[in-house]
Curated annotation (Swiss-Prot):
InterPro entries: KH_dom-like_a/b, RbfA, RbfA_dom_sf, Ribosome-bd_factorA_CS. It comes from Shewanella loihica (strain ATCC BAA-1088 / PV-4). Gene3D superfamilies: 3.30.300.20. SUPFAM superfamilies: Ribosome-binding factor A, RbfA. One of its GO terms (molecular function) is ribosomal small subunit binding. It is found in: Cytoplasm. Monomer. Binds 30S ribosomal subunits, but not 50S ribosomal subunits or 70S ribosomes. Residues 121-140 are annotated as: Disordered. Belongs to the RbfA family. This is Ribosome-binding factor A. Coiled coil: none annotated. Residues 129-140 have a biased composition (Acidic residues). One of its GO terms (cellular component) is cytosol.
Length: 140
């Protein structure tokens, strides 16, 4: 029976869960603050792991500072996670900022604004639209 997920994907999922717990509970660095682990991409040889994280900050300088703090703590985080996972070799962790969540929220807000503007215009011109609909039906 073929496996649904490859070994690297299963390890990446477990690594994501363990990293999220370690970053929330065990890391007490105030520079890092609230961090979300969005995804983990593990190399095929399991030597490297790219960890995609999001902070709830939009200021680029603050994001860079938090990312630098995570990179500085990467070795310590790696040792904590290695104690929780049963792997012969623990992947080297590299943190990468993932702006997709923030960008998605921004786009969602833009869509919501457009919808409310369209509804306002429709309500404003509602009578004209109703009259046009009646004349179109009479023509048929």
């Amino acid at each position: 029976m073929a496996r649904e997920f490859s070994r690297t994907r299963r390890i990446a999922q477990q690594l994501q869960q363990e990293l999220a717990q370690v970053l929330q509970r065990d890391i007490k660095d105030p520079r890092i603050g609230m961090v979300t682990v969005n995804d983990v991409d593990v190399s095929r040889d399991l030597n490297y792991a790219k960890v995609y994280v999001t902070f709830f900050e939009e200021d680029k300088a603050v994001v860079e500072e938090k990312l630098a703090a995570l990179e500085a703590a990467a070795g310590y985080v790696r040792s904590l996670v290695a104690g929780r996972m049963k792997l012969r070799v623990m992947p080297e962790i590299r943190f990468i900022y993932d702006a997709s969540l923030i960008e998605g929220m921004r786009m969602s807000n833009l869509v919501s604004q457009v919808i409310t503007k369209d509804k306002a215009k429709a309500a404003e011109h509602g009578r004209e639209d109703e009259e046009l609909d009646d004349t179109e039906q009479d023509d048929k």
